[in-house]
Amino acid sequence: MAKRQLNRRQNWRIEKIQGERAARAAKREQHALQELEGGDLGPEQLGLVIAHFGVQVEVEAQDGEGAGQVFRCHLRANLPALVTGDRVVWRAGNQGIGVIVAQMPRSTELCRPNNHGQLKPVAANVDLIVIVFAPAPEPHPNLIDRYLVAAEHAGLRPLLLLNKADLINDENGPGLHALLEVYRELGYPLLEVSAHQGDGMQRLQQQLDGHISVFVGQSGVGKSSLVNSLLPDAGTRVGDLSEWSGQGTHTTTTARLYHFPNGGDLIDSPGIREFGLGHVSRDDVEDGFIEFRDLFGTCRFRDCKHDREPGCALLKALDEGRIKPQRMNSYRSIIASLTEDSY
């Protein structure tokens, strides 16, 4: 059934109602915060944001008598937007409720624009981005390449992870192996695992130990199943593929941080069906295609668009097989979408 189109007045009314609801929620939260700060608060201490629930977050105490315990905390109004992985300064209050009073500097942050084009951080202090894909839903090179550009832009090390390797068959196998070979030749670390059968999970765990990682990828690729296999006590709900679309159903509604027994953390984030790059420049995209780097600036014309121009270094490399058509198509698609991407 076609999606019903709303006119301008209907859209305005919906936005007005949503704005009023948000204002009422913020007012209730501010009242609760004032009551909390009016009581006795404990000393300032360090904490780690392990989950975010709208106007409140869960903070794990990092020092003091309550180290390792989790507290629900309110946010002071003057704080910037906090995300899972943030290190903060907080004070404990009554009944296990606390107040975050400051945000510590971030070493890295993974951001994406919201529907209004404003940058929104989705995870902080991460050093490894695990790009998850699977035989179904069908993996799209363009989406993988967008994640690789985002990783390069954020200064994160990427790990490509093919989950559900047990679903590889004679029909989808040739295409999948050709896809993987492109990234292997470029030197990207790549693992094939099956969270369902356990194949390759030990090698994955070794790659994650000692790092703060985030899983990204389409819904339905098995991110929650991977978390359940790596951390059986996490209890992350698993969703099936939607029968009518072949796309995954969302199961994780907020980013949550989990600890590994041997050190390191994992942030499980909601499924992202399309990863836009409206917040990066053309130069950032070019940096994200590592095999293109030495070619930029060597074309005959300084303003070469790498389309049909004579003397184009990229087109020459494409003809000679030094650039794969799959990657060239992704590059062109991403460049063309820079001014119109939305999430």
Curated annotation (Swiss-Prot):
Pfam families noted in UniProt: RsgA_GTPase
Record bears the keyword rRNA-binding: yes
Keyword Ribonucleoprotein: no
Enzyme class: hydrolase
GO MF, one annotated term: metal ion binding
Function: One of several proteins that assist in the late maturation steps of the functional core of the 30S ribosomal subunit. Helps release RbfA from mature subunits. May play a role in the assembly of ribosomal proteins into the subunit. Circularly permuted GTPase that catalyzes slow GTP hydrolysis, GTPase activity is stimulated by the 30S ribosomal subunit.
The family this protein is said to belong to: Belongs to the TRAFAC class YlqF/YawG GTPase family. RsgA subfamily.
Protein known as: Small ribosomal subunit biogenesis GTPase RsgA
Organism, as annotated: Pseudomonas putida (strain GB-1)
Protein encoded by which gene: rsgA
